[in-house]
Structure formats: C-alpha cells, structure tokens
Amino acid sequence: MNTEMAYLVGMVLGNGEIQRGNRETTITIDIPYKNLYTDDSKDVAVYVRASVVDIRAIIEPLVGRNLTVSQTTHSTKLSFTKNNEEYVIRELLRLITRGRHHSTMRMSADLFNITSDEKISLLRGIADSTGYIRKSNIAFGQDGAHRVYIEIPANWYMVIDISNMLKDVDVPVQTIDWGHPNFRDGKLVKYNQGKPNFWKKEHQIKIFANEFLTIGFNILHKQEALEKYSEELLEFIDPEKTHKFYWEKPVRIANKPIHPGENDSSLPNEIRGRHFDSWTELAAFLGYVQ
C-alpha cells in the first residue's frame, strides 16, 4: 500500500464500479458534476479536465498508460482494463469487500490499519469522486458555516466506514443526513402529501469546511472553493466549535412521529422497523462511535 494506491481505492469506493471477466477486469470511476458552473461562474467541466492531469500522475504508475478519460455534460469518467492477475486488480479486490458497485462496497478491515497519510489520500479519492462544496452547503443558515458534503447513494455501511476513517485522522463529522424516513421526512409532510417514498434519497455526510482542509481535493474547483469557504467560516466561527465529534457536545433530540416508511423493505434488516429521533442514534447503532 502507498498513498497512490489509497487514492485509487478511495475513488473506486466513492463512485466506482468493478466489472470482472474471466481474464480481465475493468474499473470505471465516475466524477459527476452537481452544477455545470462554480459559485463564481467558472465552467466545472474545464476544471475537471485540467484536474485529470494531476489525477493521471497519481493513478498511471499503478495502471499504466491505458487510462481512458471520457467526458459528458454532467460527468467525467475514468476507466482502465487490466489482467486479473495484475497487482492493482488483486489489491483492489482485497481492499474492497462485499460488492462490485460503489452502492454495495465496503472497506476491508485492512484499510483501517494503513498509515494516516494513506487514510487521508483514500478519503481525498472519495471526496474527488463524490464530495462537493458550494455556498448553499451552509449549516443552520449561520453566516460562514460552510460544509463539505460527501454523498453516498444507498450504501448505509459506507457512510459508517467513511465516518470512522475521518475519525481516525481527527476530522469530525458535523452531521449525517440519512436517507431514512425519520430524517428526510421526519414530520411526515411529504407522506401526507401523497409522496410516501420522498425520503428515499442519498445519504450526506457533512463536514465543516475548515475541518476538511486536512483531506482536501485534487479536483481544482473543489479545492479552490474549500479554501475560500474555510477562510470565510473562520471569520465567523471559532475553530474550537467546529472541532467536536457528536459525542463531545450536547445532542439535540427531537421526538419524531412514527413514519410508515420505517418498515420499508429497502432498509437494511438491522434497522428495519426501528425508529430514530436523532442522526446520532442511527450512526451509533450502525457503528460510528467514540
């Protein structure tokens, strides 16, 4: 393991797919664009295209020069195909467990034993492929409270893996917006409007911008926004207030009504039928604890 391999693992975990054949395996990584333009009206696609040069420098020593890059209006895709016996393929399959699509993958236990620098590199790979920061990502409507969002569609356990790895490098999660009925429709507003499945959305891990500087991005427009919004945050908020894990501060518990979606078949077995009044209750139940 090295930081380059860790970064590649992170990109695959964040938004990748592994297609394994009898002799060869193809890895595809998608870098989607939430918006076509940055907050200061710069073309996101141009920034990502420029960033691919740096990403190639990290990945190509592992995969060779057969890295293919394709771009559409809303995403950039990186892909490569290697023999099943190649080191990079064997390592990816060893370090990524349970699935071949990012929606079902898990981090292997070995990844929690790598060095801090490697963990940071892995988390940066995740952030480059599925994280973003925009002016609208502000907490509580509070001036300067900018946050990075890491979006995880469907994969409940990856949320916990990422949160625990962030904890390992001393980066607190500010909150998790779970794709769960108790949080996405906690007052049954949408349910009562005839939209019973409104809550079925991606999970969002939210981290204060200044805390995420430890991780950073290799995607240029994301890194520029991170630095800008971190500076703005620190003009309004004491960094001691952002550097707190949920178990280090009072947790607001709001008694929520029972939602019929709590028994939905799409929920993992261990939480199906359970009710949660706080995001921290669900996070702790699934394994994000002190």
Where on the chain are the PLM-derived regions?
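Internal intein/HINT superfamily modules and their associated LAGLIDADG
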Residues: 1-290
